[in-house]
Amino acid sequence: MSGAILIVGAGPGIGLAAAERFGREGWTVVLAARSPRHLDPMVARLIGEGVDAHGIVLDATDPVAVQAGVRTADRLTGGLTTVLYNAAVVRQQDLFSMTDAEVSADVAVNITGGLNTIRAAESVFADRGGTILVTGGGLAVHPHASYASLGLGKAALRNLVEGLAPDLETRGIRIAVATVATLVAPDSPEATGVAETLWTLASDPSTGWERTYPLAA
């Protein structure tokens, strides 16, 4: 199985691990992030590992930029088969101590960016099918007051994925969420495990709309 994946919100943890996992299968990988300073070293690392990798600077909170970025990645790869939304603001803070600006900024990334990416991916896959993946979180089902904005975002995207999955499936588009119920550091076993979960979701349609990492014992 070969293909091409765009990872929106690529970082040194789950994003890079997923890029390496898909790259090992011969997939073309496009990383998208807001900062070239963080993006360029990741792309260089992938190329050094023999992965056909590209990078594009992209702000997921800008719907026009996301639409353009997805179409650019589609052209770069000769046809995307999967789009992953991986961006998040991880803020350990309760709702009542956050400023209005912090709430708005976190919602823009944790929710709106995901909506923008899902809409853009659907527009590309509408005529040929494809897979849309979302990096979710255990806070979506087990919330904690100290991670108010992150839990809100993960719950919203999980809800959206579950709601969209049946309709999109009838049009040849799969959408699924990897619910990550653990902390993940760069180059960690957890990052590798989440990447494997994402690969399973992309390559095995029988996994349904959600898969949790780590799997319950």
Predicted regions and their residues:
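Hydrophobic positions on the long internal alpha-helix
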Residues: G69, L84, T117-A121
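Conserved glycine-rich cofactor-binding loop
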Residues: G11-P12
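Amphipathic alpha-helical dimer-interface segment in Rossmann-like NAD(P)H-dependent oxidoreductases
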Residues: R75, V109-D127
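C-terminal helical subdomain
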Residues: T170-A217
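Catalytic loop of short-chain dehydrogenase/reductase
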Residues: D106, T131-A156, E169, V184
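Rossmann-fold cofactor-recognition segment
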Residues: L46-V64
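Conserved glycine-rich Rossmann-like NAD(P)H-binding loop of the short-chain dehydrogenase/reductase
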Residues: W27-P41
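Catalytic Tyr-X3-Lys loop
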Residues: V89, F96-L115, L157
